[in-house]
Amino acid sequence: MSAEVEVFCDGACSGNPGVGGYGAILRYGSAEKELSGADGDTTNNRMELTAAIRALEALSRPCAVTITTDSQYLVKGMTEWLSGWVRRGWVNSKKEPVLNRDLWERLRELTGKHQVRWVWVRGHNGHPENERCDALARRAIDAYRNERR
């Protein structure tokens, strides 16, 4: 895997559940691509996962990917919890069905194609790309609402 790609992603929700949005930035060398979208009935965690999914779906070939997010749910899910969920048949340590299984399964499928490193950053703490992704997600929420007026 020669291509090294940086991904920054964030999800947001106005109400939880409620209207949600995601934002992602893909960086390959000096080139950048921004992605964003919204959903009318979702949760913050679903948008965090969707941001990473959409970013990985945008990659056309296997890459070494560093994904930076402010979501501990996403980072811990992928680095600590996922293998146990799969081993236990998609139930968590409390013997309850894993929430957002559809998105976790898609992430698992997509990350299998790449060499992925997960990085957590504190949200709303001045990290430039995280702030940009948050703004993309919030703009997607606003656009979604404006389209439905």
UniProtKB/Swiss-Prot annotation:
<feature type="domain" description="RNase H type-1">
    <location>
        <begin position="1"/>
        <end position="142"/>
    </location>
</feature>
<comment type="function">
    <text>Endonuclease that specifically degrades the RNA of RNA-DNA hybrids.</text>
</comment>
<dbReference type="InterPro" id="IPR050092">
    <property type="entry name" value="RNase_H"/>
</dbReference>
<keyword id="KW-0963">Cytoplasm</keyword>
<dbReference type="GO" id="GO:0043137">
    <property type="term" value="P:DNA replication, removal of RNA primer"/>
</dbReference>
<dbReference type="GO" id="GO:0003676">
    <property type="term" value="F:nucleic acid binding"/>
</dbReference>
<comment type="similarity">
    <text>Belongs to the RNase H family.</text>
</comment>
<keyword id="KW-0479">Metal-binding</keyword>
<dbReference type="InterPro" id="IPR036397">
    <property type="entry name" value="RNaseH_sf"/>
</dbReference>
<feature type="binding site">
    <location>
        <position position="70"/>
    </location>
    <ligand>
        <name>Mg(2+) 1</name>
    </ligand>
</feature>
<dbReference type="GO" id="GO:0000287">
    <property type="term" value="F:magnesium ion binding"/>
</dbReference>
<dbReference type="InterPro" id="IPR002156">
    <property type="entry name" value="RNaseH_domain"/>
</dbReference>
<feature type="binding site">
    <location>
        <position position="48"/>
    </location>
    <ligand>
        <name>Mg(2+) 1</name>
    </ligand>
</feature>
<dbReference type="Pfam" id="PF00075">
    <property type="entry name" value="RNase_H"/>
</dbReference>
<dbReference type="InterPro" id="IPR012337">
    <property type="entry name" value="RNaseH-like_sf"/>
</dbReference>
<comment type="subunit">
    <text>Monomer.</text>
</comment>
<feature type="binding site">
    <location>
        <position position="10"/>
    </location>
    <ligand>
        <name>Mg(2+) 2</name>
    </ligand>
</feature>
<keyword id="KW-0255">Endonuclease</keyword>
<protein>
    <recommendedName>
        <fullName>Ribonuclease H</fullName>
        <ecNumber>3.1.26.4</ecNumber>
    </recommendedName>
</protein>
<keyword id="KW-0378">Hydrolase</keyword>
<dbReference type="InterPro" id="IPR022892">
    <property type="entry name" value="RNaseHI"/>
</dbReference>
<feature type="binding site">
    <location>
        <position position="134"/>
    </location>
    <ligand>
        <name>Mg(2+) 2</name>
    </ligand>
</feature>
<keyword id="KW-0460">Magnesium</keyword>
<dbReference type="GO" id="GO:0005737">
    <property type="term" value="C:cytoplasm"/>
</dbReference>
<keyword id="KW-0540">Nuclease</keyword>
<dbReference type="GO" id="GO:0004523">
    <property type="term" value="F:RNA-DNA hybrid ribonuclease activity"/>
</dbReference>
<feature type="binding site">
    <location>
        <position position="10"/>
    </location>
    <ligand>
        <name>Mg(2+) 1</name>
    </ligand>
</feature>
